[in-house]
Amino acid sequence: MPVKLAAGGRVKQNLTITPETQLLDEVTIVSTGVSRIKRSAFNAVAVDTKELQNTTKNLSDALTKAPGMKLREAGGVGSDMQLMLDGFSGKHVKVFIDGVPQEGVGSSFGLNNIPVSFADRIEVYKGVVPVGFGTDAIGGVINIVTGKKPRRWFLDASYSYGSFNTHKSYVNLGQTFKNGFTYEINAFQNYSDNDYHVDAPVKNFETGSFNESEKYRVKRFNDTYHNEAVVAKAGLVDKSWADRLMFGFTYSHMYKEIQTGVRQKTVFGEKHRRGHALMPSMEYSKRNLMTKGLDLVLTANYNRNATTNVDTARYEYNWRGEKHPLNSPGEQSHQYSRANSDNWNGTLTLNYRIDKAQTLTFNHVLNTFRRDNTSLLAAQEQKDPIAKETRKNISGLSYRLMPSERWNFSAFGKYYRQYVAGPIAETETSSNFIRTSRTVDSWGYGAAGTYFLLPGLQAKLSYEKAYRLPTIEEMFGDEDLESGDVGIRPENSDNLNLNLSYSKALGKHSIYVEGGVVYRNTKDYIQRNIQDLSGGKEGATYINYGKVLTKGYTVSARYGLGRWLSAGGNFTQMNVRDNEKTQIGTGGATENIGYKSRVPNVPYRFADFDVNLYWHDLGKKGNVLSVTYDNQYMHSFSYYSQAVGKNSDFIVPDQFSHNLALSYSLNRGRYSFSLECRNFTDEDLYDNFSLQKAGRAFYGKVRIHFGD
């Protein structure tokens, strides 16, 4: 607020500065989150989302800006998605929002559904994970950081429309009152017909012939997707007894038609899935709790997730949309079932600053899960007699020493414990199931250090003996296309990172270069395998494969020129190899013919590059025109192990795609208009074998932003 001062007069003004804090393993530092991540001892990067908020990108798209990160989607909007980080993908990489684990929240609230405006930044920790997250990731952690700084009032709203009848909208509004009461509401939706063209074999129902090598240009016809979500929070901030006390409620809904199986040759015409999730939550934080230097963060949430799978069609479909009667109902497996999942999660983080140089952090995470399945096919609902349950406890303690800004060091230990209960067949050939349960526990440990060799030249070294407990899907399946194994064992890995980065500003010029090498020696590696089912159908299952050795490196660079140019990119090379010398079968131990060969179905070389141009005060002071070009390259890789041959029919080909975006913002960002063309050279794109993504697509977006 401006202060009027008469000539010769004096006035006393009290100012209160509210710092942004993160209670992980780091000392609480008054700085931006991006700079805090860069100076930490861990192999981590922070992606600032502000430059992307005028685009139609979602959070998963933004993550591709991080070195070593690869996004793998099975199709269009709402399709199944995996994030790959330094050779690890899917369940190896854990997702958090503001430090809270997102296990069990359901697909309606996935990263590929959440608009990029939802987050201030995205933190990516690679391989070695700080104790403060309390997780069992061996691949890394993705932490979505939202804005928590109290704001007097604000409104951010956007709508976009594009190819394949795609609609996306987003509203974020909130207010903080003088008495400390604050509220915030996030709401968003996505809709798409996903009716893009693909090249696929077509079954001839008259002759019954099916030639997989003969492809036709066909249009997807059973792939409509929509989801809606509302996240509401209210509470108090800046009180003597609480820095932040918030109560929240999240509701999300999803409807998804299922066009293909695990390969594109399998096509469905009526199969679909729908679901919803309800999640109340609580968050409490207090600095200097009872004594100076002791900080506390508590979070808790409960998630009720209901998913209904419908596969009751009496017809078989081909890629032209033609249908043929089936002998028995069900395109994949005759089902009309509902899975109700209950997921409880609680976290406790204590951060104690012993002195200016030393910090202790304790973290504990409790997660419980229960799923009940009910068949709706019969006139009366039939509930499975054996529920599927897990209970997971992870505790961690770390010590951090930071005697100067030039170097710091952290050492930590973790304890993992998991209880699992669920159905298992009485014998290998039996259709009768009994309840089984087991408990596993493990100890992990690690250390991380960083040192500034010269101003702007930073070295990092980190190591962790890490464990990953099996996920719900790996133990129990997804109740549809995937089956699990309740007896699957935890993975363990020796993870080592070495990084070197350099940054320099020379007048209007700025450069940033970073390179890193990774080493992962993983045992009991959990692998997703495709298996043939009866009737020519296919599904997926999970197994403990054995030992896998990962070696690789990433390189990233960025150049800036004043306020009008930014250009940079990333290159990743990962060598993920089968490291199991023998394999155990019914006849005993035999030589593993795949020893030292590449692990199949894993991209191992990829890169991206972008150029951003800005024209400030174009047309009027405060207006900005920006033009962005970016591309993505992925080298070809094999769907099957190289040890069983190099059949070109099972190769995901080389790909090089290009995108272009134009954005014009007025009145210092209050109003924004943007146009995008994705894949403007109309390349055939695949992230997974035979599952083709969309070709050239156009999108437009309008956005308004008011308030602080």
Q: What are the residue ranges of the model-derived segments?
A:
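Extracytoplasmic beta-strand/coil segments of soluble accessory domains associated
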Residues: 44, 60-101
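Face-selective signature of the C-terminal outer-membrane beta-barrel domain
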Residues: 231-254, 273-429, 434-458, 462-464, ...
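Membrane-embedded beta-barrel scaffold of Gram-negative outer-membrane proteins
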Residues: 452, 459-464, 468, 491-551, ...
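Short, acidic, small-residue-rich periplasmic hinge/interaction motif at the N-terminus
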Residues: 6-53, 60
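Short acidic/polar hinge/loop motifs at secondary-structure boundaries
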Residues: 100-127
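Periplasmic-side early beta-strands and strand-to-turn transitions of outer-membrane beta-barrels
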Residues: 151, 160, 177-263
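Gram-negative outer-membrane beta-barrel transporters
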Residues: 512-521, 541-638
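Outer-membrane beta-barrel translocator/receptor signature
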Residues: 104, 118-120, 131-143, 148-199, ...
